Amino acid sequence: MPLLVKLGICELAVGVLSGWAMIAIVERAEALKRLGVRQLGRIRQTHLDLLMQGTILTVVGVAVASVPTWIGILLVLGAYIAPLTLGVLAFRPELQKGSMAYRGLNTAVLTGFTVAWVALAVTVLSR
C-alpha cells in the first residue's frame, strides 16, 4: 500500500476523532471555553480540513503511481500542518494577525503545498 494512502487514512482517523470536539461544541460549549477555546468555529474548520486533506492524500496515493518524493513530502506536510494551524487559532486567534512566526509558518506551509499541487499536476499531465 502506498505511503500516501497510509498517511491519508491516519489523517482521516484524526479527523474522525476530532468529531468528538464537534459534539462538544454542541453539547458542552462552555466546557470547551473553560479549556481555553476562544473560537469554536475554528474547531469545525480544523475538523473538516482534516477530513478533506486525509481524503485527498488517500486518493492521490491510489490514483497517482509513483509520486515524486519531494512532491509527496510537501503534500503531506501541507495536509498535516495546515489543519493544525487552524486548530491553534481556536485557542489563540490573535496569532493570525499578530504573530510573524505564525504567519511565516502558515505562508511557508501554504506555499509548499501550492508548489506541490502544481508540480503534481504537471507530473501527471506529462505522463
Question: Model-predicted segments: where are they?
Answer:
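Non-cytosolic membrane-interface motifs at loop->transmembrane helix junctions
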Residues: W70-L74, G98-A108
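N-terminal signal-anchor transmembrane alpha helix
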Residues: M1-V26
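Cytosolic, membrane-interface loops and tails of multi-pass inner-membrane proteins
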Residues: I25-R42
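Core segments of alpha-helical transmembrane spans in multipass integral membrane proteins
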Residues: S18, L40-V64, L77-L84
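Small-residue hotspots
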Residues: L4, G8-I9, G54, G61, ...
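Juxtamembrane boundary at the C-terminal end of a transmembrane helix
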Residues: W117-R127
